[in-house]
């Protein structure tokens, strides 16, 4: 595979060197397109840039998500963007009825609309104290998740008992649930604007809790950051100037979503195919 980029005296990319078992060589090229993976399989890069992914989650990727493409681009003067961001998720739904409950942190506070896309919810979980969170539902809305990714902790006859068992400050969960129930009964959520179809008072005991905490739920994820590029896939330097002859597309280029909270499944497919085509066309024109 590729080992390093070759630059000419002006700093433009002029080719690439390669190694295949014991053989080595170089290829002269007017344009080089890096179309490689992210860096989720590179433990050193993950620890340096996205430590949450290094703690517990199951990584989503393949052996070629080793960050080589990004490192090649950086070696030629390329800048990176969003390297500290990651897609990480452990969906508690389906069934959708679970989204009528509330998700709270270890302080008993809500922090996200429960009907958010699952990676957005998970991204906010990562921001909470100790990356700990719980999904709370009452008996009327309790069902088992269809995917066994979040652990059922237990059920309690009163909210006060649940609050104590989960180690939350006295009165915190009671106040949060009372506030939520008051507005949910009216079909409103002034705090996080959850859609009315997912609003329902959780006021019929007993109450159950599912553990969404990092290290308890089965999270999976991948990296979002990569080389900075323009609309033609040209790799940019730290001053946002294109590096002549160098292009990048796919997971080695920074994602359109910019962070895991803004990512939606399939985004990489769209950006990879669209900007890959633009990069290829521009590189071909540059090579004439």
Show which residues each predicted segment covers.
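Residues forming the flavin
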Residues: 1-178, 182-288
């Amino acid at each position: 595979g590729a080992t390093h980029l070759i630059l000419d005296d002006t700093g433009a990319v002029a080719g690439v060197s390669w190694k295949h078992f014991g053989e080595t060589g170089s290829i002269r090229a007017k344009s080089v397109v890096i179309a490689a993976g992210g860096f989720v399989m590179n433990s050193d890069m993950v620890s340096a840039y996205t430590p949450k992914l290094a703690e517990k989650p199951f990584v989503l990727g393949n052996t070629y998500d080793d960050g080589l493409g990004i490192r090649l681009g950086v070696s030629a003067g390329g800048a990176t963007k969003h390297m500290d961001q990651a897609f990480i998720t452990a969906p508690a739904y389906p069934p959708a009825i679970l989204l009528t409950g509330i998700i709270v942190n270890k302080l008993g506070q809500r922090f996200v609309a429960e009907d958010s896309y699952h990676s957005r919810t998970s991204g906010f979980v990562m921001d909470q104290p100790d990356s700990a969170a719980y999904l709370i539902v009452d008996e009327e809305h309790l069902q088992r998740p269809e995917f066994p990714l979040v652990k059922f902790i237990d059920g309690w006859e009163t909210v006060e008992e649940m609050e104590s068992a989960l180690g939350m400050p006295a009165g915190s969960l009671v106040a949060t649930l009372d506030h939520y129930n008051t507005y949910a009964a009216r079909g409103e959520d002034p705090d996080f604007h959850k859609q009315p179809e997912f609003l329902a008072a959780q006021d019929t005991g007993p109450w159950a809790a599912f553990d969404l905490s990092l290290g308890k739920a089965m999270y999976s994820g991948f990296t979002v950051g990569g080389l900075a590029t323009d609309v033609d896939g040209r790799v940019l330097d730290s001053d946002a100037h294109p590096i002549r002859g160098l292009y990048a597309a796919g997971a080695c280029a920074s994602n359109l979503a910019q962070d895991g909270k803004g990512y939606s499944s399939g985004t990489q497919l769209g950006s990879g195919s669209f900007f890959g085509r633009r990069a290829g066309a521009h590189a071909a024109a540059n090579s004439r």
